[in-house]
């Protein structure tokens, strides 16, 4: 019986670890040029679909299912461990949000009673901004809420409407991350409304406030 309980705990921990590694792995490997069909007409779906071909995974799978059926999906990753996807597509705003809530019914845990519901949230934002050159700045931000701590990743690409390519913009990422002291646990919230970025700031007194990173016309 103890062996079965141990295996169940290991499976859950591995599940959270794998999820956290999604953001961590992307943070290490995002700087790739991505081919997109050249066009003066840009949509968030077009940019995200091209990005998703380079970086497939559960977020992309959920979005593709949403496009086909009008809803995302709920899957049982392990026994009593569910992952529920939701998609917010706002074409006029140039914005996509894909979120999951991992729900686990606790069996054995020092911090939970048997039968308690444990929820871990994960989220992906995608958005784009118009640049003075006519090109677009495309952003991806990911937060994976792990068992112990969150793993976050941020990426920016410049979309050349004439060449049809998403080229990584590491300097833009560097500028934004410098504001949050390069903290890999800070989730940068891309805008559904407006152009500015936001993030949660935790001060030493335990107060939580939203801070803004202003859009400056060509970047942040």
What residues fall within each predicted segment?
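Sec-dependent N-terminal signal peptides
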Residues: 4-13
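Terminal domain-start segments
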Residues: 21-127
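Sec/Tat signal peptide C-region and signal peptidase I cleavage site
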Residues: 16-20
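Short aromatic loop motif centered on NTY/YTY
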Residues: 165-220
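Short, surface-exposed coil-to-beta transition loops
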Residues: 119-124, 138, 142, 149-154, ...
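Mid-length scaffold segments of soluble, non-membrane domains
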Residues: 132-169
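Structural signature of eukaryotic scaffold interfaces centered on beta-propeller domains
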Residues: 124-133, 185-193
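Surface-exposed loop/turn elements that mediate protein-protein interactions on large endomembrane-trafficking
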Residues: 96-114, 158-170, 215-219
């Amino acid at each position: 019986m103890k062996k079965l309980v141990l295996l169940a705990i290991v499976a859950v921990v591995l599940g959270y670890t794998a999820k956290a590694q999604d953001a961590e792995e992307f943070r290490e490997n995002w700087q790739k040029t991505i081919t997109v069909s050249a066009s003066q007409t840009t949509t968030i779906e077009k940019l995200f679909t091209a990005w998703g071909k380079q970086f497939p995974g559960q977020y992309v799978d959920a979005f593709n299912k949403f496009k086909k059926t009008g809803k995302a999906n709920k899957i049982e990753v392990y026994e009593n461990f569910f992952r529920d996807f939701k998609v917010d597509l706002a074409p006029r705003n140039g914005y996509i949000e894909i979120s999951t809530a991992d729900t686990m019914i606790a069996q054995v845990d020092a911090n939970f009673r048997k039968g308690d519901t444990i929820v871990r949230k994960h989220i992906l934002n995608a958005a784009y901004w118009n640049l003075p050159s006519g090109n677009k700045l495309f952003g991806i931000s990911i937060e994976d809420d792990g068992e112990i701590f969150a793993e976050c990743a941020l990426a920016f690409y410049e979309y050349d409407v004439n060449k049809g390519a998403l080229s990584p913009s590491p300097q833009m990422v560097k500028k934004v991350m410098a504001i949050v002291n390069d903290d890999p646990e800070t989730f940068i919230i891309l805008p559904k409304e407006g152009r500015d970025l936001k993030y949660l700031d935790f001060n030493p007194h335990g107060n939580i406030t939203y801070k803004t990173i202003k859009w400056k016309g060509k970047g942040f």
